Amino acid sequence: MRHRRVFLTLLLAMLAVPDVAESQIEISSRASSIQVGGRAHAQYAASSVGDADNDFFLRRVRLIADITLNDFVTARVQPDFARGKIALQDVYVRLGSSSKFRVWVGQFKRAFDIFELSSSTDLSIIERDARVEGVSGCSGVSGICSYSRLIEKLKYAERDQGIKIDGSSGRLSYQATLTNGTGINVSDENDGKSYSGRVTFAASEKVSLSGQLGVHDYLIESAGNSTARGIAWGVDVEFGTWRDGAHIQASVIRGDNWKSLDSSNSEATFFTTQIVASYYTERRGQLAGIEPLLRLSLGDPDTAVGKNAGTVVTPGLMFYLQGKSKSGANLDIYSPQSGDTALSFKVQTYLYF
């Protein structure tokens, strides 16, 4: 009962936050113009696991500087100050005056997963990986066996440092990345590189279909730190768009779980799928909109082994204050094939400016 009062008090306090202007500040600096914006996400997370901590914390505190030198050269610098630490997120220079072909150099998201490529300012699932504090045991990646947990910890998705190309023509768009493979703000550990590619076809104004391929290089310590490569591939579909009625994102991915090797250093095969459906209804008055949502996720870290997969069901509700500024709650329900069901209740406020 005490936790319920905390949840309700926090949610009501979030809804009392005044509207926030979303126009970015534009300034001039030397030979460039700079637009400054940012986001601040404050979260409360409570787990059903007995020895887990229930925690208030700042999930994201990011300032974004979008820099324009001319029609050919743009850049972004995005530091994150969450939890009292400084970590660079997007930091890149982008070259190109045509939407058909552009080159990025720096740190950015790999060209792979639809949920990772979707901004946290748009997503209404509070945590992509549906983490439940106090739960572990997913083969190779620890934590829970969920869609984003697998592809993030196996480094097929998330940010990395390197080179990216992207573009679009008609109904087709593409992006490809060549990166270190070690992740955000980390130097390379070998001479190998990781590759990712993604192609999207806009079947209609509201429906898009995509296919993606990722090749990740890693070190095998038991083989003298020799370099090997894991491969993952998948397809996804998106119906609708953000904050406009029905919106659905669904994906299926299969590949090598290189963090789970057998005695001959062969990778296990993982399989994961996820669908997130939401419906945004515009409102008048204090609230700009209301959005209920539902996530279904399955993660199997080793398809050759029985009863080691897990499922996630996440009902949620978001209250929009203005634009992308919102507050809401998710209940992540994790059910492993072997073990007890665990819950994580999360409330988060999203400030976008």
List PLM regions with ranges:
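Intrinsically disordered, low-complexity peptide-like regions
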Residues: 1, 17, 127, 328-330
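Bacterial N-terminal signal peptides that target proteins for export
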Residues: 1-8
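Outer-membrane beta-barrel pore domains
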Residues: 48-51, 70, 94-96, 104-107, ...
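Sec/Tat signal peptide C-region and signal peptidase I cleavage site
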Residues: 17-23
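Outer membrane beta-barrel
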Residues: 25-184, 189-196, 200-209, 274-282, ...
